């Protein structure tokens, strides 16, 4: 009745062919039940990992789930059981598409576990999930992202993906062949980008040093 469907027995929901109804305004219980299930599932997942880590490797940090998307119920479970919330953010700046007011409300530090900027005018054929028009734009994009990350109090670190361009013929896992490395596949640095990254990182260190004084 709550879902607006006819079902002869609860066990029929376990049938592989069963398709739950799409949430709709007429039956708000559908969305509420989905959210409850998602939270319950995520709680069990993160509690299992947290308990195992505390037992086998105490005094280690649990760095979250490296979310590619922000699902509120799952993120809340992560905050409940993990030491850090981690996200792979393929955006021009961390604040694009992420509700940092809500994240701050969870009272856990945020680690950006992946971000990058690529282009298609150098290296392999793919510019990644945040492609730019040309190689020269990568340095300024990196600087902007880092600056915006430092402006957000909840962010404690950012991690560039990755050091080396991916193989032209595609990596083994899924065929990705992106140009977003600091060096090319022949181990030759993209010097302009490397210099820009170094400049931005040094500026960040100096800024942190001034704040610590």
Predicted regions and their residues:
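Aromatic- and acidic-residue-enriched carbohydrate-binding clefts of CAZyme catalytic domains
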Residues: 1-32, 121-123
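Structured segments of extracytoplasmic/periplasmic soluble domains
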Residues: 2, 6, 52-56, 148, ...
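Helix N-terminus capping/helix-initiation residues
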Residues: 9, 64, 133-134, 190
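General small-molecule cofactor/ligand-binding pocket signal
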Residues: 13, 63, 159
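Residue-level preference for long, well-ordered alpha-helices that form the structural scaffold
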Residues: 26, 30, 34, 38, ...
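Glycoside hydrolase catalytic-domain groove-lining segments
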Residues: 36-51, 55-128, 143, 147
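C-terminal structured "cap/appendage" subdomains that terminate the fold
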Residues: 129-179
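Aromatic-rich peripheral "rim/lid" segments of glycoside hydrolase catalytic domains that contact
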Residues: 161-213
């Amino acid at each position: 009745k709550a879902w607006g469907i006819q079902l002869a027995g609860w066990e029929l929901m376990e049938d592989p062919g069963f398709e739950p109804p799409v949430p709709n305004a007429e039956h708000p219980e559908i969305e509420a039940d989905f959210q409850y299930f998602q939270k319950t599932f995520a709680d069990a997942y993160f509690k299992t990992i947290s308990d195992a880590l505390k037992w086998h490797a105490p005094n280690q940090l649990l760095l979250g789930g490296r979310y590619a998307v922000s699902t509120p119920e799952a993120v809340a479970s992560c905050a409940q059981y993990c030491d850090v919330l981690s996200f792979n953010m393929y955006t021009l700046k961390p604040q694009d598409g992420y509700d940092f007011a809500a994240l701050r409300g969870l009272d856990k530090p945020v680690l950006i576990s992946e971000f990058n900027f690529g282009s298609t005018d150098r290296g392999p054929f793919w510019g990644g999930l945040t492609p730019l028009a040309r190689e020269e734009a990568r340095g300024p994009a990196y600087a902007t992202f880092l600056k915006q990350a430092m402006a957000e109090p909840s962010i404690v670190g950012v991690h560039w993906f990755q050091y080396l361009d991916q193989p032209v013929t595609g990596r083994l896992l899924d065929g990705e062949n992106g140009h977003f490395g600091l060096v090319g596949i022949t181990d030759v640095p993209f010097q302009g980008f490397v210099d820009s990254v170094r400049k931005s990182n040094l500026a960040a260190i100096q800024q942190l040093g001034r704040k610590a004084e």
